[in-house]
């Protein structure tokens, strides 16, 4: 099941507060500013560290790299969200949303950062008694175990959402997926730690689905689940030639989503090359 696997992004970077979908959408802009500020602030600190002690520099470098990766990830996410309509397509299986390869790479980049610098720390731990080296050596072991655990069963997946007349299939970047029939009345209203909390009929606990680098807003996802779990007529359209048009109509942002500070699709006239 989806909730058995942790996000690629470190859990300690994600707020434990439970918020609404609207709050989560508007919060993406704030998170970008925070990570961009952290990346800018880390540059002079790294310069001072390398002048003071190379070992201290080695300890701080992953932190600066982490802020930079997350800032770039969110900036690129905004770009792809504006072009969100083009990410959905009709296939023989149903209506599919695929994540661009660039976002997949950025989603995996933290592991590359941890493993590369932690490997240097492990070498430092063997060659000296410095505390930073020991710390990074432990981080190397933990990162290696986490990477193997995430991708042991499958390779990174581009397809994240599949909508059919029977239900919706949600897939993580790790390739682990879960199918939710419309008969289970899936719904979502809250977000916790970057994960959308999905409620289903007959299930006590919520299913968690990561939204951090998914180019769809939480309110769009909420509307998708609510509409097709309630409307039989719209579900029937998913099995016909107008399946893609039906899904895009449901996902079309509201005027509130266009006007507030959240990221969403560009207005139709803009996405089609208009003014």
Where are these regions (language model features)?
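Actinobacteria-biased recognition of intrinsically disordered, low-complexity terminal regions
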Residues: 1-27, 238-275
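Alpha-helical membrane-embedded segments
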Residues: 135-151
């Amino acid at each position: 099941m989806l909730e058995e696997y942790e996000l690629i992004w470190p859990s300690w970077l994600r707020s434990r507060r439970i918020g609404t979908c609207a709050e989560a959408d508007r919060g993406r802009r704030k998170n970008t500013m925070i990570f961009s500020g952290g990346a800018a602030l880390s540059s002079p600190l790294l310069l001072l560290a390398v002048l003071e002690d190379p070992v201290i520099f080695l300890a701080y470098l992953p932190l600066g790299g982490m802020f930079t990766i997350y800032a770039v990830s969110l900036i690129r996410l905004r770009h792809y969200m504006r072009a969100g309509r083009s990410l959905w397509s009709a296939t023989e299986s149903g209506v599919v949303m695929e994540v661009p390869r660039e976002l997949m790479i950025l989603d995996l980049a933290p592991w590359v950062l941890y493993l590369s610098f932690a490997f240097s720390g492990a070498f430092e731990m063997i060659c000296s008694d410095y505390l930073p080296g020991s710390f990074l050596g432990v981080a190397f072991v933990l990162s290696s175990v986490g990477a193997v655990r995430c991708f042991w069963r499958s390779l990174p997946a581009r397809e994240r959402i599949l909508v059919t007349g029977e239900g919706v299939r949600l897939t993580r970047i790790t390739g682990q997926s879960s199918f939710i029939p419309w008969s289970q009345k899936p719904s979502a209203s809250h977000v916790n730690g970057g994960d959308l909390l999905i409620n289903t009929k007959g299930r006590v606990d919520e299913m968690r689905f990561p939204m951090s680098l998914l180019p769809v807003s939480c309110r769009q996802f909420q509307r998708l689940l609510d509409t097709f779990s309630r409307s039989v007529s719209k579900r029937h359209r998913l099995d016909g030639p107008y399946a893609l048009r039906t899904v895009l109509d449901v996902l079309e942002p509201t005027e509130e989503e266009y006007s507030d500070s959240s990221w969403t699709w560009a207005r139709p006239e803009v996405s089609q090359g208009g003014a």
